Amino acid sequence: MKILLVEDDDVLIKVLTKNLTTHHYIVDVVKDGEMGWTYGSTFEYDLIILDIMLPNLDGISLCKRFRAQGYTVPILLLTAQDNITAKVQGLDAGADDYVVKPFDPIELIARIRALLRRGSNNPFPLLTWGDLLLNPSTCEVTYNGCPLNLTTMEYDLLELLLRNCQHVFSSEELLDKLWSSEDFPSEATVRSHVRRLRHKLVAAGAPHDFIATMHGRGYYLKAPSTEEVNNLSVTPENNSHSAAVIVKSRETESDRPQHLIPSDSQQQYLAFLNETWTRTKPQSLDQMGILLQIVRDLQTNQLTPQQQTQAQHVAHKLAGTLGIFGLTKTMHIARQLEYWLGGRERLQPKHAPLMKTLVTALQQDIDHTTLIQLSQIPAGQSPLLLMISADNEFNQSIVAVAASRGIRIQIAPTPDIAPAMLTNEPVLDGFGEDPDVILMRLPSMPSRAEVIEQPNSELSNIWKTLQTFAERYPKLPIVVIGDRGEMSDRLEAMRRGGKLFLVTPTPPEQIVDTVVNLLRDPEIPNKVMILDDDQDWLRTLPTLLKPWGFKVTTLADPQQFWTVLQAVTPDALVLDVNMPQINGFELCQLLRSDPHWQRLPVLFLSVLTDPTTQNQAFAVGGDDYLCKPVKGVELANRILRRLQRVRAWAN
């Protein structure tokens, strides 16, 4: 499969090309938007990867140009801009997906595979044809269970044929699909690779014409025999090729751990990163000279708009580069610089102290990083602990233990976080993702008499911070740890949104074990089905209920109620009262007449406020009744209350 990469960051180009070629993709690289248009409109590609900030023509404009000219090739945007506006702008321009730097190489490759499957005749994760099975995730190929040892080009050729199993490929098409635009092999080279691939397939037991030749046209996969197709399925009714593929795909993938890199491959990738960092570090330090000059010019009020724009591009590139190497903390500093430099207003001398602090911290972090550690490589599915603490000694003890448990940590200084969240400033953008659990370290608390005499502003701020995080992450467990275990402290922590309260001195191992136990018992998302004929209102519900972790299914047609109900098997049901053809009361009675659904919580939601209607709702088997308009938090709490009662009854 052939990919066009349009990116101007040399380090990112090197790392991305390494990952893509390892997974058997052919990559063409250009460094500006206009060249991206030239290549993309001249050669045929299976996927285009674009950075948003490009010289000559930005990625958004380039994406729009491709779509305006009728090009339907999948486009993946790759950028450091982690905000909703940028994502919406990119997707509206015609992009098919959006990945934020720093990215997990495994996730990026998985997204690429998903995009390529959409345009393929074979949309399944595993590619099969008769007794042949190719797993794009692991690049493994077997025939009738026997592994095939293929060269890179043989693998690429076989994958192309499998993804386009109904197509006859001419030699010219294969040359265009399988070789870079800079290579010019002959048709004899194609015939040689086909011949060697056929030989290996026949040696594994495949028919001689497994890869068939249509004279004058090209090469194609011959349809497998009926016996081969039936052998793929584990049940008599799954005799179709599509069903067989699904069955085999599920069986094979269920036995294989997901999103894991073999240790030897990971070590090779780590060695590659360190080798690349050795060459990149001096270049990054050289770029710091531009940022240091910005600080000096800012102090003397001599900064020009052109200099500020240039510095923003430097910070943007540094953020992307540092993210590639897993230097998350350093990347966050670069992102903050990019944010301030890219503001709508020109920087003033009053901003000089802030800029000097950020630039100095960035320079020191880059200078002190001599070796990329394994733990710095993007960790994929490993859980993220957000620790809100200003106690450096405590932080270091937790970091050491958490690393041994496979937990990633982000440390947030308490005074900076709550105000930023309350004013919607982008300080939290640097975290890149929502945490899985929050650990909050309370400051040293004075005695009650001292508090009465002189209120502790730091303690007041920490309680506000706790409440702020609890409101933003209502389903997220927050662990509070303090020096005192008095009832007043525990009560305040629970009122503000804390879930667990620990008292120092608690060993770091015990604290991390507490976090691990919270992670081991994640709540299964509650499935909620909502039936209402107001489609505009229905469209708002998934967003309204998202903070509570509900998996929402909406339905506007009462005639489809029973079919959707059985398919979704919800944990709770919300019904409108007045609907065309069948009203909510009738649907509730229908539900209660089936033993399987007699205990399903049913909430009625209606504009009708009269007591007669409400009494009728409870008479037909409803559990609750809400009047429109209703706020998302009220609806969510009513649903949660019904679910808690059902589960308490079941226990």
UniProtKB/Swiss-Prot annotation:
Q: Which InterPro entries match?
A: CheY-like_superfamily, HPT_dom_sf, OmpR/PhoB-type_DNA-bd, Sig_transdc_His_kin_Hpt_dom, Sig_transdc_resp-reg_C-effctor, Sig_transdc_resp-reg_receiver, WalR-like, WH-like_DNA-bd_sf
* PTM annotation (4-aspartylphosphate): residues: 51
Where in the chain is the DNA-binding region found? 124-223
Keywords per UniProt: Activator, DNA-binding, Phosphoprotein, Repeat, Transcription, Transcription regulation, Two-component regulatory system
Return the GO cellular component terms, semicolon-separated.
cytosol; protein-DNA complex
For this UniProt entry, the molecular function terms from Gene Ontology, in alphabetical order, are: phosphorelay response regulator activity; transcription cis-regulatory region binding
The organism's place on the tree of life at top rank: Bacteria
Q: Which Gene3D superfamilies match?
A: 3.40.50.2300, 6.10.250.690, Winged helix-like DNA-binding domain superfamily/Winged helix DNA-binding domain
Q: Name one GO biological process term.
A: regulation of DNA-templated transcription
Q: According to its UniProt record, what is one Pfam family this protein matches?
A: Trans_reg_C
Q: Where is the Response regulatory domain?
A: 2-116, 384-519, 527-643
Q: What does this protein do?
A: Required for chromatic adaptation. Thought to be a positive regulator of phycobiliproteins.
State the protein's name.
Answer: Protein RcaC
Name the species this protein comes from.
Microchaete diplosiphon
Q: What is the lineage of its organism?
A: Bacteria, Bacillati, Cyanobacteriota, Cyanophyceae, Nostocales
Gene behind this protein: rcaC
